[in-house]
């Protein structure tokens, strides 16, 4: 049951314990709540409806508003100290987890309000974009930050898309385990003195 229309919607759970449903959302706004029930109620509070943007990239997207150690973001302090968790701006950082097989579920992270602490650790590029967007549109904005420094673009694309580029060598099988190749050492011993 969604608080914006109080309509109950039902669905069935499949053999994997998964379910899916669609519900009509109102115009941008909130906060709202949604209650789920399997006989016992679970209510999610403080839900906003509005723009949601996926912000991805490499180190230019990964750098937080506070900057990296020894690499501060010039002029970021006023944005950090003036961050307001009551503002309709939400931040979600996907935790980095590598895999050699395509991932369909199980993303680790959580939505956070725009508090000074959370803004400081959030992607600077994503935050400054979302901050401007929220002020311009005057609607709630959600930012999903998913980046990894020095990652290849191929890692962000599915196999079907990549197969259209013959110059990219795709493995026939998915590597599930990693062995370690023994390294070699080269050392030239200094000549020993002769009598």
Question: Model-predicted segments: where are they?
Answer:
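Acidic, His- and aromatic-enriched active-site or binding-groove loops in soluble protein domains
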Residues: 161-180
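Short, flexible loop/turn elements at secondary-structure junctions
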Residues: 25-27, 93-96, 147-150
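Short secondary-structure boundary/capping segments
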Residues: 68-73, 157-164
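N-terminal beta-rich core of secreted/periplasmic extracellular enzymes
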Residues: 36-121, 139-141
